[in-house]
Structure formats: C-alpha cells, structure tokens
Amino acid sequence: MGDPKRPKKKYVEGKPKRLWNSDLLMSELRLIGEYGLRNKKELWLARALLRSIKHRAREILSAPMEIRGEAEKRLKDRLFRMGLISDINIPLDSVLALDVTAVLERRLQTLVYRKGMARSIHEARQLIVHGHISINGVRVRSPGYLVPRNLEDGIGFAPTSRIVKAKVTQQVNQGGQAVNQ
C-alpha cells in the first residue's frame, strides 16, 4: 500500500475513449507531424489544458452576474498573458471556440521554428533539448514549455552555445560584422 510509485498523470481523462477511431488517429497523426510532438501524450497534455480552460469558461458563463464579471476578467487576462487569445475584450464564448492548435502554437518548439531559428520543427526540438535555446538569457530545455506573451521576444540562442560561436565565426570569415543574436 503506502505511497504511489509515480504521481498521477496530468492528462486525466485525456486519452480518447475510443483509441482505434480512424478519424481521430489521422487527426492526431497530422498534429503530431505538424508540431513535431514526440508522442501522443504531449498532445493529450495540450488537450487536457485546453479542456480545463474551457471547463472554467463554462463555469463562469453559468455563474451569477455579480460573480461572473471579476472571474471572467481574471480568466481572459490569464489567457491573454499565455498568448492563447489576442484580445482581452473578446466575448467569453470565443474562449470556448479555442482548439488544441492554439495551445500547440505557444510551445517553445513551435515558436523557435516559426521564428526561423531552426530549419524544421524537429531541428527546433533538438536545439532546445541540447541547450542551445534560451529565453531572456535562461536556458530552457523543455520543448513543451508554454511561452507567455511577454517572454516571446526574449527567445534566442544561448550566449554560450556553440551554434552562436559558429555563426559569429562564419560571419567574420565572410567579411561581415560579428552580430550577437
């Protein structure tokens, strides 16, 4: 009996009810390929996060008006800081329309690829895991890190990374100025 061997999974009820549904399998496979996910567990974690956000939004919509105003403002502010919504003044019903791609677009792996720091989504994952990527000077080694909106501009190569040194050396050899990214 005693303590459990491992903590509880974070994607409680994140697994689909019917694992062998061909439409679901194809959509999951497309998302895994498009966002460079390592396994379906990463997709289920994103779905679980989105499910909890939508659940909170439904609770707020069903709450009385005196409670609803402040709770709605807090939820929208949190989602805006996370980067999942583009404007705080959107109706709460549009929060219910969010899909899993909104969460997957905020992953560090996706943002590194979208910024052009990697040639492919898989290379972006490798750069992160090997410690070549930092956010505001702090190395982040988790490709699944959800980057808040205020830290998005701080994504860059780690200053001590060999990739930065190689690029600076290459620029100097070509006669250009050494520019630190």
Swiss-Prot record:
Pfam families (UniProt xref): S4
InterPro entries in the cross-refs: Ribosomal_uS4 (IPR022801), Ribosomal_uS4_arc (IPR022802), Ribosomal_uS4_CS (IPR018079), Ribosomal_uS4_euk/arc (IPR005710), Ribosomal_uS4_N (IPR001912), S4_RNA-bd (IPR002942), S4_RNA-bd_sf (IPR036986)
GO molecular function, one term: structural constituent of ribosome
SMART domains cross-referenced by the UniProt entry: Ribosomal_S4, S4
Assigned GO CC terms: small ribosomal subunit
Any one biological process term the GO annotation gives: ribosomal small subunit biogenesis
NCBIfam families: PRK04051.1, uS4_arch
Function: One of the primary rRNA binding proteins, it binds directly to 16S rRNA where it nucleates assembly of the body of the 30S subunit.
Family: Belongs to the universal ribosomal protein uS4 family.
Protein's UniProt name: Small ribosomal subunit protein uS4
